[in-house]
Amino acid sequence: MAVTPPRILSAPRVIGDVRATLGEGLCWSTRQQAIWWVDILEHRLYRDAAAGAHDAWSFDETISAVAERADGPGLAVTLRRGLALFDPATRALVRLDEPERERAGNRFNDGKCDAQGRFWGGTMDFAVREPTGAFYRFDAAGRAERAIDPGWIVTNGPTWTLDGRTMFVNDTVRRRVVAHAFDPATGAVGAARDWLAFGEADGHPDGMTTDAAGRLWIAHWGGACVTCHDPASAADNSVGAAATSV
């Protein structure tokens, strides 16, 4: 499928100068017209409204990914051990499944919902040394099922093609993007193939998303940029950033 390369209309600008230690997990809320994001290592959740208002909440452990709920108030968030529901208005926190209680050295990292509303989250070795990370699919009741087996030092993503039949995940330490066959009806993950590999000068592929034209946008940890790729993996554009780790 051919897509038109994106036009970059303006340079990146700072919307919240909070000097995060490890800022991640951007989630745009159409309902609130605001961006949710987290500082993983400082255990903080932020909301930056388009109108300029800035709010923050603190937790007792890492918080790494955010998704807005469709069937209830507040958010689904990944804490160190698993998924939880959090209502910013009341600060009520309800813990759901924690699938890696036996892996004391792991934590959850990136995550998001697919088009059917299932939440996906990946784990990683907190020390960034051992290949103990895996990917989990959470059902509507918050129960976790391991969808991709351990073997990952740092997981990031996922994101999907517009037709929902391919899921992309980032093998961050090994600098590669892996594409999996995907069944959107059941959430089943199929055969994997290397989709894109980066060199040392590119940094490490971190968070990513798919735009309305089907292009993948990939943040580069240590690469000071965000790159855009068409569905065949060819680079369409690059946006530089004032920070080395994006």
Q: Where do the language-model regions lie?
A:
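A short beta-strand motif characteristic of beta-propeller blades
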Residues: 11-17, 52-58, 94-101, 143-149, ...
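Conserved beta-strand positions in repeat-built beta-propeller and related beta-rich domains
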Residues: 29-30, 35-40, 76-81, 119-129, ...
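Flexible "stalk/tail and boundary" regions
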Residues: 71-73, 88, 136-143, 162, ...
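Hydrophobic alpha-helical segments and helix pairs
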Residues: 91-148
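Loop/turn-rich, solvent-exposed surfaces of beta-rich toroidal or solenoidal domains
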Residues: 176, 197-233, 244
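Short loop/turn segments immediately following beta-strands, especially the blade-tip
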Residues: 180-187, 231-236
